[in-house]
From Swiss-Prot:
Protein name: Bifunctional protein FolD 1
PROSITE patterns in the cross-refs: THF_DHG_CYH_1
Annotated source species: Rubrobacter xylanophilus (strain DSM 9941 / JCM 11954 / NBRC 16129 / PRD-1)
Family per similarity comment: Belongs to the tetrahydrofolate dehydrogenase/cyclohydrolase family.
GO CC field: cytosol
Keyword rRNA processing on entry: no
Binding site for NADP(+): G164, R165, S166, S189, I230
Complexes and interactors: Homodimer.
UniProt xrefs under SUPFAM superfamilies: Aminoacid dehydrogenase-like, N-terminal domain, NAD(P)-binding Rossmann-fold domains
Entry keyword annotation includes Metal-binding: no
Function of the molecule: Catalyzes the oxidation of 5,10-methylenetetrahydrofolate to 5,10-methenyltetrahydrofolate and then the hydrolysis of 5,10-methenyltetrahydrofolate to 10-formyltetrahydrofolate.
Recorded catalytic activity of this chain's protein: (6R)-5,10-methylene-5,6,7,8-tetrahydrofolate + NADP(+) = (6R)-5,10-methenyltetrahydrofolate + NADPH; (6R)-5,10-methenyltetrahydrofolate + H2O = (6R)-10-formyltetrahydrofolate + H(+)
Length: 284
């Protein structure tokens, strides 16, 4: 039976480290503040933002919400992004996605100062990651790496397969795995013989956004399996992209859903906010 990689406990370690770092900066008079841009009233987005702001309060990070109606003009959001870029009191900020239908996210993300891009989702941040320049890393991919590293899972020289090629998770995670000297294959909806490819993986990360798509037939005996997916089941519970019970019988280690990658994503947003504050102190 697979060992469960407990994202909650590892995230708690990171939160404690962030809280200590925030206290240290505050003692030196350095502000640590996260601003959030929210357009519209999508229930999931409102909940996510509320959770993130509560996380900030728990580690001593000040947070401010900039909320707009769904019909907010694009130019008004762009003006706010430019203002936050130039505000020395703001350590970092992010735009809660998805945005309402009338708003194009790309110009807004492109306008974010990379040193304040705590989500790590702007084209500039993606480019810096791709060429190996220092940058704030996307929260979910970085959370996966930290969870593996802090759980004692070595990556150097191992064969890693990522299922999913999104800009949010799959692509940046593949780059981070390469940084760890893993040998990386990326699978997607056009991959032929998906199970044949994934069975080669010593470390298998599933981030396809399809409930229960990976089962025992996709998993090598003794592999480490990371389930990034999260879906609301008919009974109200949460499930992932991996059929957990059958995969647990073959894998050496497995992230649960919930309690695996999700807590790590939230913790890495706090980590990035602290890093952004440190960077601003160095530049001052």
């Amino acid at each position: 039976m697979a060992r469960l990689l407990d994202g909650r406990s590892v995230a708690a370690q990171i939160r404690a480290e962030v809280a200590e770092g925030v206290s240290e900066l505050k003692r030196r008079g350095v502000p640590v503040r996260l601003d959030v841009i929210l357009a519209g009233e999508d229930p999931a987005s409102v909940t996510y933002v509320s959770n993130k702001r509560r996380d900030c309060a728990e580690v001593g990070i000040e947070s401010r919400l900039h909320a707009f109606p769904a019909d907010v003009p694009q130019k008004e959001l762009l003006a706010l992004v430019e203002r936050l870029n130039g505000d020395p009191e703001v350590s970092g900020f992010f735009i809660q996605l998805p945005l309402p239908g009338g708003v194009d996210p790309l110009p807004l993300l492109s306008a974010i100062d990379p040193s304040k891009d705590v989500d790590g989702l702007s084209p500039q941040s993606a480019g810096r990651l791709a060429v190996g320049l220092p940058s704030l890393l996307p929260c979910t991919p970085h959370g996966v790496i930290q969870l593996l590293r802090r759980s004692g899972v070595g990556l150097e020289g191992r064969e890693a397969v990522v299922v999913g090629r999104s800009n949010l998770v799959g692509k940046p995670l593949a780059l981070l795995l390469l940084r760890e000297n893993a040998t990386v294959t990326v699978c997607h909806s056009r991959t032929r013989d998906l199970a044949g490819v994934t069975r080669r993986a010593e470390v298998l990360v599933v981030a396809a956004g399809r409930r229960g798509m990976v089962g025992a037939e996709h998993v090598r005996e003794g592999a480490v399996v990371v389930d990034v997916g999260i879906h609301r089941a008919e009974d109200g519970g949460l499930t992932g992209d991996v059929r957990q019970e059958e995969v647990a019988a073959r894998a050496a280690a497995l992230t649960p859903v919930p309690g695996g990658v999700g807590p790590m994503t939230r913790a890495m947003l706090l980590y990035n906010t602290l890093e952004a504050a440190r960077l601003r102190e160095e530049r001052a």
